[in-house]
Amino acid sequence: MSSLFINDHPLVQSKLALLRDVKTNSKEFRELVGEMASLLCYDAVREFKTKTTEVETPFGTAEANVLEREIGVVALLRAGIGMAEGIQNMIPTAKIGHIGLYRDPNTLQPIEYFCKVPKDAENMHIFVLDPMLATGGTAAAAIQFLKERGVKDITFLCIVCGREGVQKIQAEHPDVDIYAAALDSAITEDGYIVPGLGDVGNRMYGTK
């Protein structure tokens, strides 16, 4: 079964408090989303394998360790975009892709309307990004789409998750670990996590 890792680092939790605060403006909110993604990514790659190489320093040659595999990022539109920028700041070589999904109003099944994944994604470790993991339907569908394209190694990063979403990922994708800053207690009928962060896309871009 996939594991849920809640990052309780004081810096992560301090930034989470600012994200939750309704008084935080859009500019600050966007910056915090990116910063939080960087911190979650830092935690998630802790156990990744490295390989040894040599680099030239100003005074000679040094043995160094670098990540063994390429890392790719797939942001779920639209709120995941802010997280992707944060991870690219941490790992500049990370390739960025996007998946857009909407729910069919009759069947409630997720429908893909946009999908652009990194070239050779099947050879990378892919981070799927969405600030909120509520019911888990969109996240689970996006992960399935990636697997159908040959991606084998996937980690899901979010800022806040709900139990329902975690359980769905664990049931449908037991090989996908989840990294988050908080596990909240409830989900509204409209699919919002409580207390949550509100509508992350709207708060990031100042829309309603």
Give the predicted meaning of each segment.
Residues 1-208:
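PRPP-associated nucleotide enzymes
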